[in-house]
């Protein structure tokens, strides 16, 4: 089974927050882009065999989950509803 890498960088940190808040509304920012790219590279290496890349998919899902939870938490602390 493929390894998702030992890098477990927090997706929503001060640097990411500043980038996210400073971007225009039409600009897309995904702090989990690196994890997404690793999963796509795994698919290419393994001729599209998703079972070989399940660790990478799980790492991406976990990254997105952490990112969304941290954003919600910061919005709650700031008193923003949306």
From Swiss-Prot:
Localization terms from the record: Mitochondrion intermembrane space
Gene: cox-23
Feature: compositional bias, Basic and acidic residues: 7-27
Domain of life: Eukaryota
Transit peptide among keywords: yes
Cellular component annotations (GO), alphabetically ordered: mitochondrial intermembrane space; mitochondrion
PANTHER family: COILED-COIL-HELIX-COILED-COIL-HELIX DOMAIN-CONTAINING PROTEIN 7
InterPro entries given in the database record: COX23, Cys_alpha_HP_mot_SF
Species annotation: Neurospora crassa (strain ATCC 24698 / 74-OR23-1A / CBS 708.71 / DSM 1257 / FGSC 987)
Disulfide bonds: 32-63, 42-53
Keyword ATP-binding part of the UniProt annotation: no
Region Disordered, residue ranges: 1-27
Name of protein: Cytochrome c oxidase-assembly factor cox-23, mitochondrial
Keywords of this entry: Disulfide bond, Mitochondrion, Transit peptide
UniProt family annotation: Belongs to the COX23 family.
Domain CHCH intervals: 29-71
Motif Cx9C motif 2 in this chain: 53-63
Broad class of where this protein is predominantly found: mitochondrion
Short motif Cx9C motif 1, span: 32-42
GO BP: mitochondrial respiratory chain complex assembly
